[in-house]
Amino acid sequence: MSHTSRRLLCVVAVSAATLCAAAQDDGGNKISVTGSVQSDIIIPQEDKAINARDYDEWALTNTYADVALTSKYIDAGARFEFVKFPLPTFYDEDGFKGWGVPNIYVKAHFKSWDLTLGNFYEQFGSGFILRTYEERTLGIDNSLLGGRLVVRPVKGVTVKALAGKQRRFWDLNKSWVSGADVELNLDQWFKGMADKGTYLTLGASWVNKYEKEDDIMVGGTHKLNMPSTVNAFDVRANFQKGGFNILAEYAWKGEDPAQGNALTGRDYSYIYHPGNVAMLSATYSKKGLSVLLQAKRSDAMSFKSKRNETSGIASAINHLPAFTMDQTYALAALYPYATQPDGEWAYQAELAYRFKRNTALGGKYGMNVKVNFSHVHSIDRRDHAGNEFDGTAKGTDGYGSAFFKWGDEMYYQDFNIQIEKRLSRSFNLNLMYMNQFYNQTIVEGEGGMVHSDIFIADAKYRINRKLTLRGELQYLSTDEDDGDWLYGLLELSFLPHWMFTISDMYNSGVTNQHYYQGLVTFSHGSHRLQLGYGRTREGWNCAGGVCRRVPSSKGVTLSYNYNF
């Protein structure tokens, strides 16, 4: 961690201690202490059959401990992290290893304003131009270290202003990120709207990145004029009436030449192409029925606080949500889609319906059915002429794009149908079918289109008040990549403390390898301890459209979670 960041953290720590002491002495105001501990450990073993490597350390761990102090007017908190010998997923990530207290903050909150100093997380709108958050399963913590002011000057109006430097593992990026957001809740101004169940929220945001120029050469002789300031803007409107809700949002980002990816066979690194994203999302819900319709177009919306960032999980200022169904079953999540910020058209539709009890389809206990469809396509791109020095796109605007026109490639598509049915007082059955097209070249860099059909059965039988048995059977059929997969799981729960799980994922298409797991879980109050042994397949772990590569591994695992 740099000297500047250490000094900032020291100032915040002293401020937190002083303000909390003042709050404690102010009229007997009580201070509440909450926190959590999370520790995930593996004792790795080499397994050449699945390319599970050996490590210099006998054990690897990601361990976190959070503590937060809250009072009537002052809050403060800190997080300790020990990832000096991190889990295999993060072991080779440049800059990830370390230990210390990288996150500390103090917050003053009153009726009409809040002030935060230190590390903080924030999101403007849907996150198109600003979203800082923590996702430990991916190793993401892109918090800002600085200050944030939230003001509520009048009823229905919220104004935010912030500035800081972004965390990159155990350091801070050199650029400054600043921004402002205003949100108007018109229903709080007009009493008649709320009385009729009508709500309208309008929002606008601005984000600025200031980053000193880098020496980027073209053809070995020409230096690009890199913009030190990049601005981004966002406007949005959210309307709600009864069970109907519609959100429209548009964001624009200025020219931000940066390290890029090769798309359509051409490298678009360091092009001067402004970005934009437009989204329309509509939902309707009432008892027993919900409908979702979404469309989104994005173009050149990668926005990072480090121009030459090579990590796929670090330095992101913004976030583009995925328009695909979140999958929790092992084989349904085998080929997850990663949002492509360089450009995509994305659509999603979902219908969920509950058949009532004592009807022909609902039966004695009723039945839930959910149908989901997602489609992601490339945007139109017409490459412009290259520069005069080496013929590449560097230093040019790269390409033109007609807004409503598709490109030539499908990136992803899936169709899901899920049925949840209670067959008796003690037996529940969930069935799922998924048809998927996954462009492996776009997401992973090579492999072509993978078309798969996935079948899943999930059954739960309640033996008695304390004993429950659950089982899963899954089958993935495909002629591409590694071919067919089979998966089985048995889980026995003894309330209130114990759970025993065994599972196996088997590739019957190419490798004929088994990825077996055995787990014993003990829970008591706020404590949860899990001991396991087995293999983990190499693949991708995704959350919210952000993905990272997971290496294969084998060994003894131990996880502990505690909340207080």
Cite the ranges covered by each PLM segment.
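Short glycine/proline- and aromatic-enriched beta-strand/turn motifs that initiate or cap beta-hairpins
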Residues: 26-53, 374-376
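Outer membrane beta-barrel
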Residues: 68-165, 192-194, 282-308, 482
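Short loop/turn motifs that connect adjacent beta-strands in outer-membrane beta-barrel proteins
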Residues: 24-33, 69-76, 108-112, 116, ...
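Bacterial Sec-dependent N-terminal signal peptides
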Residues: 1-34, 564
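Surface-exposed strand-loop-strand hairpins of Gram-negative outer-membrane beta-barrel proteins
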Residues: 41-60, 398-404
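Long, low-hydrophobicity, solvent-exposed regions enriched in small/turn-prone and acidic residues
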Residues: 55-57, 61-70, 77
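Hydrophobic, small-residue-rich alpha-helical packing segments that form membrane-like cores
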Residues: 140-221, 228-233
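Exposed, low-structure sequence patches enriched in small/polar residues
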Residues: 38, 193-197, 226-564
